[in-house]
Amino acid sequence: MNLSIFLFLIGILGFILNRKNIILMIIAIEIMLLAVTLLVLISSFGFDDNVGQTFSLYIISIAGAESVIGLSILVAFYRLFLVLNYL
């Protein structure tokens, strides 16, 4: 549980400190989502519940789809403006 909280705080810190780099912001969001997934998995193993393990698979698949959408928007932004920093 402490590891997932630590990872979530690293993700928040990375999101706040890298406001000018969109790729690092997407990576920080992915770290936060994986920290939540780790917490769900730890809780499901602790309570002997298979629903939490299934829910963690959904979280991972949604996080993957979110990163694909974010990176495709980033590629479209780069093709229009030829720069990745938005400030």
From Swiss-Prot:
Molecular function, one GO term: NADH dehydrogenase (ubiquinone) activity
Keywords carried by this UniProt record: Electron transport, Membrane, Mitochondrion, Mitochondrion inner membrane, NAD, Respiratory chain, Translocase, Transmembrane, Transmembrane helix, Transport, Ubiquinone
Gene3D superfamilies cross-referenced by the UniProt entry: 1.10.287.3510
Places the protein is found: Mitochondrion inner membrane
EC number: 7.1.1.2
Reaction equation(s) it catalyzes: a ubiquinone + NADH + 5 H(+)(in) = a ubiquinol + NAD(+) + 4 H(+)(out)
TM annotation in the entry: 1-21, 22-42, 57-77
Main location: mitochondrion
Description of how the protein assembles with itself and partners: Core subunit of respiratory chain NADH dehydrogenase (Complex I) which is composed of 45 different subunits.
Record-stated family: Belongs to the complex I subunit 4L family.
PANTHER family in UniProt: NADH-UBIQUINONE OXIDOREDUCTASE CHAIN 4L, NADH-UBIQUINONE OXIDOREDUCTASE SUBUNIT ND4L
Name of this chain's protein: NADH-ubiquinone oxidoreductase chain 4L
Natural source organism: Moniliophthora perniciosa (strain FA553 / isolate CP02)
